[in-house]
């Protein structure tokens, strides 16, 4: 909106990432930070390696996680605080197993809206605690907590799911987003990262390196490229690109790809044309080949091994 930002101190709910959780899941560390750093270093494969370095630096230096937000609607924190007590008091937050079970059952049946309905506090506390002695917390969770918990209901709690996930795949901006929140949430509840591998890709920019935007009129759609240049040109552009960094695309770049495509196509046509009547009866033994042809075969063999190895490693 380009409006000025106003900073002000307000009460919020935090997750202490350096507190000993004492949850019996301390194989990889006692605190969320310890578990996260161990997971980054020992349990997760990073493609490219720079992704590991970036997230490791963020986790090492980050403060506690601010969980709460003040919005009209969202996933509620679903907790009650005792009136007249301060946050450092052990009884400040109402902790009760029966109450938690009631909350889970109602929210599972009716959704998050049940928390925001009129009379919700009285309904949840009925028969357990005097409603007048408690204040219902109306803050919602950070939306990154929502996405960060997907490992539980998408993977762990599904019969066809596998936990941890083989791979989390997102753009470079998700080191501070999805990868980050998923790691903290999982380390707090499960003791380790929810993924075995993380692959980070760059973004597609216009020919001059600017972010694509409808307002700037510099967007390039795949359909537009295919219509103008053909699907094979787009495929070749993708195949020869390093997806781990930001990529540029535009008319001049695609013209260069078209030239490369013509060279490949003409070379293939030349080879096929000369091999049209080849039956295998005129084979020349390896020992009788000229040194240059032996070298070419050697390079082809090296490339073949490298490609197969890369496919298997991936």
Q: Each PLM stretch: what is its role?
A:
Residues 1-278, 294-314:
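Structured secondary-structure scaffolds
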Residues 260-261, 281-290:
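Primarily the internal scaffold of c-type cytochrome electron-transfer domains
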């Amino acid at each position: 909106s380009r409006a000025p930002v106003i900073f002000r101190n307000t009460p919020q709910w935090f997750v202490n990432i350096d507190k000993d959780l004492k949850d019996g899941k301390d194989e990889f560390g006692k605190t969320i930070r310890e578990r996260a750093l161990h997971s980054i270093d020992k349990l997760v494969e990073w493609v490219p390696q720079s992704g590991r370095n970036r997230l490791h630096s963020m986790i090492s230096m980050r403060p506690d996680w601010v969980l709460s937000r003040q919005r009209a609607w969202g996933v509620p924190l679903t907790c009650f605080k005792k009136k007249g007590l301060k946050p450092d008091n052990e009884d400040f937050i109402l902790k009760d197993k029966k109450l938690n079970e009631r909350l889970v059952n109602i929210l599972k049946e009716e959704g998050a809206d049940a928390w925001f309905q009129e009379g919700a506090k009285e309904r949840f506390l009925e028969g357990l605690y005097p409603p007048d002695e408690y204040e219902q917390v109306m803050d919602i969770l950070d939306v990154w907590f929502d996405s960060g918990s997907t490992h539980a209901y998408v993977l762990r709690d599904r019969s066809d799911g596998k936990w941890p996930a083989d791979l989390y795949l997102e753009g470079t901006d998700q080191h501070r987003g999805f990868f980050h929140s998923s790691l903290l949430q999982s380390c707090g509840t499960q003791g380790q990262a929810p993924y075995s591998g993380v692959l980070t890709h760059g973004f597609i920019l216009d020919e001059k390196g600017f972010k694509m935007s409808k307002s700037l009129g510099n967007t390039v759609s795949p359909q537009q490229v295919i219509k103008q240049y053909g699907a094979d040109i787009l495929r070749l552009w993708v195949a020869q690109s390093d997806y781990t960094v930001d990529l540029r695309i535009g008319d001049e770049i695609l013209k260069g790809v078209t030239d490369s495509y013509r060279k490949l196509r003409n070379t293939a046509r030349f080879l096929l044309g000369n091999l049209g009547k080849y039956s295998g009866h005129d084979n020349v033994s390896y020992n009788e080949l000229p040194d240059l042809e032996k070298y070419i075969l050697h390079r082809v063999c090296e490339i073949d091994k490298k490609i197969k190895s890369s496919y298997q490693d991936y």
